């Protein structure tokens, strides 16, 4: 994937969600929930602080993260794959 996020931005590929209910019913449309987990594909250089220094991000490529998909999260198609571009502040946790 040929993309390099700027500053404190992170590129995440959403994880697939099981599309069956606990009872074995196949869920479609709005009943099928989207995952709020994904794999970090790329990270920016870091957040630029008021004094001009750069604070490195806490996440790295390959991390599995839980994110808050709200205002400011951008969906994009890169090389045929849908990815999310978001700020590190939209990440809530690193899994594992």
UniProtKB/Swiss-Prot annotation:
BP GO annotations: chaperone cofactor-dependent protein refolding
Localization of this protein: Cytoplasm
Give GO terms: molecular function aspect only: ATP binding; metal ion binding; protein folding chaperone; protein-folding chaperone binding; unfolded protein binding
Keyword Cytoplasm among UniProt keywords:
yes
Show the PROSITE patterns listed in the entry. CHAPERONINS_CPN10
Q: Which key words are in the record?
A: Chaperone, Cytoplasm
CDD domains, per the entry: cpn10
The entry describes its oligomerization and partners as:
Heptamer of 7 subunits arranged in a ring. Interacts with the chaperonin GroEL.
Say what the protein does.
Together with the chaperonin GroEL, plays an essential role in assisting protein folding. The GroEL-GroES system forms a nano-cage that allows encapsulation of the non-native substrate proteins and provides a physical environment optimized to promote and accelerate protein folding. GroES binds to the apical surface of the GroEL ring, thereby capping the opening of the GroEL channel.
Name of this protein: Co-chaperonin GroES
The lineage, from the top, is: Bacteria, Pseudomonadati, Pseudomonadota, Gammaproteobacteria, Alteromonadales
């Amino acid at each position: 994937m040929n993309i390099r996020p700027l500053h404190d931005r992170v590129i995440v590929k959403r994880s697939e969600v099981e599309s069956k209910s606990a009872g074995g019913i196949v869920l479609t449309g709005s009943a099928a929930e989207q995952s709020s987990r994904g794999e970090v594909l790329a990270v920016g250089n870091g957040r630029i602080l008021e004094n001009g220094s750069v604070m490195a991000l806490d996440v790295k490529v390959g991390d599995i993260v839980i994110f808050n998909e709200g205002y400011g999260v951008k969906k994009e198609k890169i090389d045929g794959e849908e990815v999310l571009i978001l700020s590190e502040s939209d990440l809530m946790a690193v899994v594992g």
